[in-house]
Regions:
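A detector for small-residue-rich transmembrane helices and their helix-helix packing motifs
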Residues: 1-194
Length: 194
């Protein structure tokens, strides 16, 4: 593993430092389709330190999970393609948009579909990854009806993109044939667990 997820975090942090230069953010902010390069550049911009830190944490955590299973090339492909998909959704719904969360939600979508039983903490509660992803998705759907500075449609588009990729990449599970238990197996289980 080459830790591209952490390298992306480093690039995003460096861009945030550059955003302190007057006019930098405005030059690369997504504000419609008239400047198509901003579909990509806006992914690396963040509105404030909390926005930045929450996205860096999520990208580091879920990006490393993704990268360890699928590799760095697929990580970059999903990050950029999912980020562009979420930027396109944002351009339809918001006057201006920035942030890596749509790209991160694409990564989360792949992880949720391909590693659904992996336990993660969400809202202080341990739960399977697929359940956590559904909770986040439902929060974003609810957020659409309560306007805020969060680009909920970007999150939803990123998650949908990632889930579609995850379904395409998912390997069929090997089914274990159901064989009847015999008395010896039951006794062994009782000795171990009772």
């Amino acid at each position: 593993m080459k830790y591209y997820a952490l390298a992306l975090c480093g690039v995003i942090f460096a861009v945030f430092l550059l955003q302190q230069i007057p006019g930098f953010t405005e030059a690369f902010l997504l504000s419609g389709f008239d400047r198509p390069w901003t579909l990509v550049t806006s992914i690396f911009l963040h509105g404030d330190p909390m926005h930045l830190l929450s996205n860096l944490f999520a990208l580091g955590l879920f990006g490393l999970m993704f990268e360890s299973r699928f590799g760095e090339k697929r990580l970059l492909a999903v990050f950029f393609a999912g980020g562009i998909a979420s930027s396109i959704a944002s351009a339809f719904f918001y006057d201006a948009s920035l942030g890596a969360s749509g790209a991160i939600f694409a990564i989360i979508g792949v992880v949720a579909v391909t590693m659904p039983r992996m336990i993660v903490w969400n809202l202080g509660v341990p739960m399977p990854m697929i359940v956590a992803a559904i909770v986040w998705l439902l929060l974003d759907v609810a957020g659409v009806f309560f306007p805020s500075s969060t680009a909920n449609m970007a999150h939803i588009a990123g998650m949908a993109f990632g889930a579609a990729v995850g379904i395409a990449w998912r390997k069929p599970e090997k089914r274990v044939a159901n064989k009847p238990l015999n008395d010896e197996d039951i006794d062994k289980w009782e000795e171990e667990w009772m």
